[in-house]
Curated annotation (Swiss-Prot):
Source organism of the structure: Danio rerio
Region of interest (Disordered), residue spans: 1-70, 155-175, 197-254
Tissue: Expressed in the anterior neural keel and later in the preoptic area, optic stalk and ventral retina.
Biased composition range(s): Basic and acidic residues: 25-38, 159-170
Sequence intervals crossing the membrane: none
Gene3D superfamilies: Homeodomain-like (1.10.10.60)
UniProt protein name: Ventral anterior homeobox 2
GO cellular component labels: nucleus
Length: 307
């Protein structure tokens, strides 16, 4: 009994061990298969199949990185050389979407006959649309787009010409107004200007015996007050006014000659000499008027005491 039981138990254990070894073999086989599949796949496919990793970017990024490592720009970029303001040349990477190398559009060259017909139509009507434009393009062997663009450019040119004409007219008008104003001011100044008075014969031709009135040197007294010489025919106690003071134009003194003193005698306009009392004559001292007043006061005081 016990032998059979042990033999049965050993068989079950062997079966279990066999089953366990088979499961391990199966797991190992699966792992080896997965490894071989991963090894056979390309790096791009493996990166796309494994989410959550840094290699899960699109294929372009990997290609860009590969191009950068190789020093080659990607297909959508291009390099150009630019000279800055300082004269240094720099290399700039720009996207090809800008299309900098696009050839310029060729300008349409019109013949003399076409220009003549287009100009006639423009003088007739500045806007040609519809059937008229189609017919004109057919007659001139041009496309409607070319005719339309020509009329647009012609209208723009006409506006520019009109603007220039108006600017020139306004500038010329302002210049003419300024010129008229200047001429008017000059005319007013000429009319308002007072003619110069005639020269004084007495000053121009002095008496040969006595010399010029202004040119005669003044004689200084002991008190320091200067007095001028008196012309003939005038008394020592006379006092007059000069013609130059009446006319309002003072005579210009000569260089090196002191100005005339305040006390001088000149005949008046009437020619008569109005003699003043000797008490009001010119004295030799600047303090004489005060002395005269004191003398009068003393005389009045003496009269009062006598009376």
């Amino acid at each position: 009994m016990f032998d059979q039981a042990t033999s049965m138990g050993d068989g079950i254990a062997e079966d279990r061990n066999h089953c366990g070894s088979n499961s391990l073999c199966r797991d190992r086989g699966r792992e080896s298969k997965s490894r071989t599949e991963v090894g056979n796949r390309s790096p791009v496919q493996s990166s796309t199949d494994t989410p959550g990793t840094s290699a899960s970017t699109p294929t372009s990024s990997s290609e860009d990185g590969h191009d950068k490592l190789l020093g080659v720009d990607p297909d959508y970029c291009r390099r150009i050389l630019v000279r800055d303001a300082k004269g240094t040349i720099r290399e700039i990477v720009l996207p090809k979407g800008l299309d900098l190398d696009r050839p310029k559009r060729t300008r349409t060259s019109f013949t003399a006959e076409q220009l003549y017909r287009l100009e006639l139509e423009f003088q007739r009507c500045q806007y040609v649309v519809g059937r008229e434009r189609t017919e004109l393009a057919r007659q001139l062997n041009l496309s409607e787009t070319q005719v339309k663009v020509w009329f647009q450019n012609r209208r723009t040119k006409q506006k520019k010409d009109q603007t220039k004409d108006t600017d020139k007219r306004s500038s010329s008008t302002s210049e003419s107004l300024a010129t008229c104003n200047i001429l008017r001011l000059l005319e007013q100044g000429r009319l308002l200007s007072v003619p110069a008075p005639p020269p004084n014969p007495l000053l121009a031709h002095p008496h040969p015996g006595n010399g010029s009135l202004l040119g005669s040197p003044s004689v200084s007294t002991s008190s320091g007050v200067s007095s001028s010489t008196t012309p003939p025919g005038a008394g020592s106690g006379t006092f007059g006014l000069s013609l130059s003071s009446l006319s309002g134009t003072p005579p210009s003194p000569r260089l090196g000659v002191p100005p005339p003193s305040l006390c001088f005698t000149m005949p008046l306009l009437s020619g008569a000499h109005h003699e003043l009392p000797s008490g009001y004559g010119c004295g030799t001292s600047a303090f004489e008027p005060y002395m005269r007043i004191e003398r009068k006061d003393g005389e009045l005081g003496g009269k009062k005491t006598v009376s």
